[in-house]
């Protein structure tokens, strides 16, 4: 029991969407619920998951478990991203640009949830193409996964960080 309480304190969860879906059978419709949840520690780790169940709380619980299994580490520089990036998934894309301290998170709906739970405090973003919540979340995660900090770039080029900036 103590371990479960510890886990819930480690990550903050945010329900992005809950959708009622129907399966048409001979006797009528059978309804189920799908939940899209984003979890993060506001310190560079974020993930998302989907869950489906007969009841909403059960769907959310399944989505949270799925999200915790699929976490991404996000490089951050003073509360923002190291560089501009566009994340793509399907026909949806999310453009993210670093912002000056004090700007805040300028993002809509699902993108805002991912960025805030990743611990990013200042960023400008624009969603383009598909505005389906799951595609927007996946495009945002894709962009965050493709971010590289100065140390990674220096290592790839076989140089020191100082040589990059000269």
Curated annotation (Swiss-Prot):
GO terms for molecular function: rRNA binding; structural constituent of ribosome. GO terms for cellular component: small ribosomal subunit. One of its GO terms (biological process) is translation. Residues 11-74 form the S5 DRBM domain. SUPFAM superfamilies: dsRNA-binding domain-like (SSF54768), Ribosomal protein S5 domain 2-like (SSF54211). This is Small ribosomal subunit protein uS5. Keywords: Ribonucleoprotein, Ribosomal protein, RNA-binding, rRNA-binding. InterPro entries: Ribosomal_Su5_D2-typ_SF (IPR020568), Ribosomal_uS5 (IPR000851), Ribosomal_uS5_bac-type (IPR005712), Ribosomal_uS5_C (IPR005324), Ribosomal_uS5_N (IPR013810), Ribosomal_uS5_N_CS (IPR018192), Ribsml_uS5_D2-typ_fold_subgr (IPR014721). With S4 and S12 plays an important role in translational accuracy. Located at the back of the 30S subunit body where it stabilizes the conformation of the head with respect to the body. The lineage of its organism: Bacteria, Bacillati, Bacillota, Bacilli, Bacillales. The keyword Ribonucleoprotein applies. The N-terminal domain interacts with the head of the 30S subunit; the C-terminal domain interacts with the body and contacts protein S4. The interaction surface between S4 and S5 is involved in control of translational fidelity. Part of the 30S ribosomal subunit. Contacts proteins S4 and S8. It holds the Pfam family Ribosomal_S5_C. PANTHER family: MITOCHONDRIAL RIBOSOMAL PROTEIN S5. Belongs to the universal ribosomal protein uS5 family.
């Amino acid at each position: 029991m103590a371990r479960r309480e510890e886990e819930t304190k480690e990550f903050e969860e945010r329900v992005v969407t809950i959708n009622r879906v129907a399966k048409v059978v001979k006797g009528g419709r059978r309804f189920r619920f799908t939940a899209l949840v984003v979890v993060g520690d506001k310190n560079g780790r974020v993930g998302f998951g989907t869950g489906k169940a007969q009841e909403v709380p059960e769907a959310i619980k399944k989505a949270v478990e799925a999200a915790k299994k699929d976490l991404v580490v996000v490089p951050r520089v003073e509360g923002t991203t190291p560089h501009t990036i566009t994340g793509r998934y399907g026909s949806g894309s999310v453009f993210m640009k670093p912002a000056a301290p004090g700007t805040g998170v300028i993002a809509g709906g699902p993108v805002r949830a991912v960025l805030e739970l990743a611990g990013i405090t200042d960023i400008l973003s624009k969603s383009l193409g598909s505005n389906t919540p799951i595609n927007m979340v996946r495009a945002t995660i894709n962009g965050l996964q493709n971010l590289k900090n100065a140390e990674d770039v220096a290592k790839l080029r076989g140089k020191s960080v100082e040589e990059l900036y000269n």
